[in-house]
């Protein structure tokens, strides 16, 4: 095992990055993502590691905010943070060789080799996060005065490599980390093939326009945002003496497993066509997006599998989805914008009697239409009002979701299916990633993972083992969704 810090290939001077209001309000937690590569035969692990380090250094030159230290704003009375950069900025990077990981994988999953993991569709959810991610010890987190914007780990297994990324959500949303990955892949490919990283250049200004997401309207009341609350205690760190760099963990005593399902391009087309015909107005079929159609299917069938309609304590179920506002702002933000721009969530609430009505194309259309309407209502005005709500609160961390997710009836979706992560070319012995997994465990969140080269995508769902058994036996759900792990 080797621990190093990968610095920018072109050093920076001292710089403080002022965060936007949406960055300040964002979750203060590390988001975790896993990429799996199949290594070419006789790949040289040392050469692979060297290429990854060189590529990362060049990528950080282009996207430097991920090399930052997340620190409190001096003297702030509102729990505000900022990013600090300097000549020594970099990303803690752990390199784990094959013999150090194989026995742990054999214990916690289906095997210790790439072939064994691939055979069972990469059941990495059962592997403890500390084995696959470069994590700071709890003792350091409790007393930290600053935290890395990104930590990375590359672990070699027989025939493959598992990349674990943990980034502080204050730095950026998932689209931002995908921008970093795109740059990292490009420069790694160049180094592996040509022995050079070229001439990486600093990020263009539009990708760092955080200042545009400040100064919302005044006197916005929380009642303007259903299913949000002002709660100073909800996110407060467990230790009163700790700087608010990380939120209080949102935990539950209920035991949930994470299952992975695959929607092929053919299945997505079939599902969309079925819903479109059921919703047809005259001779014109309604064209739901894949995200809307899968959201409706998951919302209904996961609720049925969880027997929510039999729980007298709940009458309604909330569906919430994180929205990328880059293209909804005027003028639009650059695709490569680094920062958080996905609040407020799109939200729609329906009676459980309707959500859990027997599944049919018509009943799914009702849910898909509600999801579409909620997403369509999210515009720049709504985002600006949310910024005003946060800025008008006593602390930037006071605004929080008022959701009742697992074991409650509410469902939150993080939809990354539009990202090109699985189609990025890393070159050399790596090629394209063959698998991506969320390593995060946000309570009650369903993850729609990036689309693969064939046009399908995987979905990760949380439920109990008994609920999972019912979902596997659900012929209407498995008509479109293939159980993976």
Swiss-Prot record:
Belongs to the plant acyltransferase family. It comes from Cordyceps militaris (strain CM01) (Caterpillar fungus). Acyltransferase; part of the gene cluster that mediates the biosynthesis of beauveriolides I and III, cyclodepsipeptides acting as inhibitors of the acyl-CoA:cholesterol acyltransferase. The HR-PKS cm3B initiates the biosynthesis of beauveriolides by iteratively catalyzing the formation of the linear polyketide chain. The ATP-dependent acetyl-CoA ligase cm3D converts the polyketide carboxylic acid to a CoA thioester which id shuttled to the first T domain in the NRPS cm3A by the acetyltransferase cm3C. Pathway: Secondary metabolite biosynthesis. The active site is at residue 169. GO terms for molecular function: acyltransferase activity, transferring groups other than amino-acyl groups. The lineage of its organism: Eukaryota, Fungi, Dikarya, Ascomycota, Pezizomycotina. Beauveriolides inhibit selectively the acyl-CoA:cholesterol acyl-transferases (ACATs), leading to blocking the synthesis of cholesteryl esters and decreasing the cholesterol concentration, which suggests that beauveriolides are promising as potential lead compounds for antiatherosclerotic agents. Moreover, this activity correlates with inhibitory activities of beauveriolides in the secretion of amyloid-beta-peptide, which suggests that beauveriolides may be an attractive new candidate for the treatment of Alzheimer's disease. Its EC number is 2.3.1.-. The keyword Secreted does not apply. This is Acyltransferase cm3D. Keywords: Acyltransferase, Transferase. PANTHER family: ACYLTRANSFERASE EASC, TRICHOTHECENE 3-O-ACETYLTRANSFERASE. InterPro entries: CAT-like_dom_sf, Plant_Fungal_Acyltransferase. Monomer.
């Amino acid at each position: 095992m080797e621990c190093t810090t990968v610095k920018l290939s072109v050093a920076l001077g001292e710089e403080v990055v002022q965060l936007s209001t949406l960055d300040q309000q964002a979750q203060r937690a590390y988001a975790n993502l896993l990429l799996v590569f199949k290594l070419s035969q006789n790949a040289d692990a040392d050469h692979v590691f060297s290429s990854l380090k060189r590529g990362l250094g060049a990528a950080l030159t282009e996207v430097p905010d991920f090399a930052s230290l997340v620190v409190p704003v001096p003297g702030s009375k509102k729990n505000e943070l900022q990013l600090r950069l300097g000549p020594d900025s970099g990303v803690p990077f752990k390199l784990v060789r094959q013999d150090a990981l194989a026995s742990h994988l054999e214990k916690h999953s289906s095997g210790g080799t790439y072939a064994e993991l691939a055979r069972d569709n990469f059941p990495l959810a059962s592997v403890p996060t500390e084995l696959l991610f470069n994590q700071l010890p709890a003792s350091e987190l409790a007393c930290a005065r600053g935290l890395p914007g990104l930590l990375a780990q590359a672990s070699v297994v027989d025939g493959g490599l598992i990349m674990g990324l943990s980034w502080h959500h204050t730095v950026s949303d998932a689209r931002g980390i995908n921008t970093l990955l795109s740059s990292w892949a490009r420069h790694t490919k160049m180094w592996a093939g040509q022995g050079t990283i070229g001439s990486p250049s600093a990020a263009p200004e539009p990708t760092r326009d955080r200042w545009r997401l400040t100064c919302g309207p005044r006197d916005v009341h929380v009642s303007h945002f259903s299913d949000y609350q002002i709660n100073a205690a909800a996110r407060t760190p467990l230790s009163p003496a700790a700087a608010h760099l990380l939120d209080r963990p949102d935990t539950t005593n209920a035991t949930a497993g994470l299952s992975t399902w695959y929607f092929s391009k053919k299945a997505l087309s079939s599902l969309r066509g079925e819903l479109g015909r059921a919703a047809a107005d005259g001779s014109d079929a309604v064209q739901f997006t894949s995200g809307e159609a899968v959201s409706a299917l998951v919302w209904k069938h996961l609720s049925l599998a969880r027997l929510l309609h039999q729980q007298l304590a709940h009458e309604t179920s909330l569906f919430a989805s994180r929205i990328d506002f880059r293209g909804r702002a005027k003028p639009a933000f650059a695709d490569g914008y680094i920062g958080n721009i996905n609040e407020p969530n799109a939200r729609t609430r329906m009676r459980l009697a309707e959500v859990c009505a027997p599944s049919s194309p018509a009943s799914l259309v009702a849910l898909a239409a509600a999801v579409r309407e909620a997403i369509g209502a999210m515009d720049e005005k709504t985002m600006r009002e949310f910024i005003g709500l946060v800025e008008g609160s006593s602390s930037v961390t006071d605004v929080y979701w008022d959701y009742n997710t697992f074991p409650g009836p509410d469902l939150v979706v993080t939809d990354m299916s539009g990202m090109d992560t699985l189609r990025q070319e890393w070159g050399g012995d790596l090629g394209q990633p063959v698998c991506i997994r969320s390593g995060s465990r946000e309570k009650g969140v369903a993850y729609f993972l990036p689309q693969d080269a064939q046009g399908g995508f995987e979905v990760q769902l949380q439920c109990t083992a008994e609920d999972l058994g019912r979902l596997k036996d659900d012929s209407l759900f498995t008509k479109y969704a293939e159980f993976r792990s």
